[in-house]
Amino acid sequence: TSDDCLKGGSGVNDTDYHPFEIWKNMTSTIGPLDELWYRLFAAISRCNRALVSLDKYGNSKLGETETKQRIAEVKFLRAHFYYKLITVFRKVPWIDEEVFKNNTQEQTHNDAFTYQQLFEKIIADFQTAYDVLPETQTEGGRVNKIAAASYLAKCYLQLAWGDGYEQTTGISHINTSYMQKVVDYTDVVSHSHYGYLEDYGDIFLPEHKNSKESIFAVQCSDYKDDNTKFGRANWSNTLNGCWGIWSCGWDFHKPSQNLVDAFKTKNGLPEFEDFDQTPAHPVNGHPTTQKWDPRLFHTVGMPTFPYKYEKQYTL
């Protein structure tokens, strides 16, 4: 397939990732998938606990208005986690606050609801967030109405194609009422205070954190600020830093020639048919007839080009 990168790494604990690289022998019990399943359901469990607590203590502790908003925020997060689950695993057990209160998790099976029904439950949570939350929040990272609209558009877009039509190339099976909802919620986002930054590269720089292009983002923290041992950080950034020559470090997500070639363009459009027939790569300061999608230079570190737009860090 196109747009491949190489896993990299050579430790014995990296073998679980090899099936993803060759797209064979993938099972739900291999490390990365099993861990993803566990962590997402752990997050859903926390959401359910929060909903039960809000229902029991919210009005007396927070007041009716704030309780209603916090419930909407938690339901957004639960839907976010379930959206990830259904996208990766498709068949998943629906465990909500009622299942949690009745302690019937082990009796809840992954075939109790159809793909359509699961999406409808996810949509219901996002819809609650859309109906209740304001368009803006004063605290960074708190979800809002526009974030819910974005997810509703994504959900209806997947539902519109229909279940079981993965190999279908026509459009007659598409649900037009769902597609209209995609358009409607997309319009909400398009006419909101969110939008594209003027410079594509800015979205990768820390000074543009929570910019107008960031609709929903996890908020990381330093251990000095949150009283944890290591802080709430993005560990993947640590694994993919730029190390000096002869320096030790990690070696993950190595770009392949195929990935670079996928950024070739012709007349402003991607070269879908023959992009990988002749391997090539751009060289800074040496113009060629081959044109490239500028996103390549934000995706792959290449010799003669600076890392993170700093000339002193030219590779």
Where are these predicted regions, by residue range?
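Contiguous, well-ordered alpha-helical segments that form the cores/surfaces of helical PPI scaffolds
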Residues: E73, H80, S150-L157
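Conserved, well-structured interaction surfaces
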Residues: S10-F89, Q105-E120, A124-G140, E271, ...
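Short, conserved phosphate-binding/catalytic loop or strand-edge motifs used
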Residues: I95-N103, Y151
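Short acidic (Asp/Glu) and glycine-rich catalytic loops that position anionic groups and cofactors
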Residues: N103-E106, G164
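Short, well-structured active-site flanking segments
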Residues: I86-E98
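An aromatic- and glycine-enriched ligand-binding surface/loop that stacks and positions planar moieties
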Residues: T1-T15, V92, F119, Q127-Y130, ...
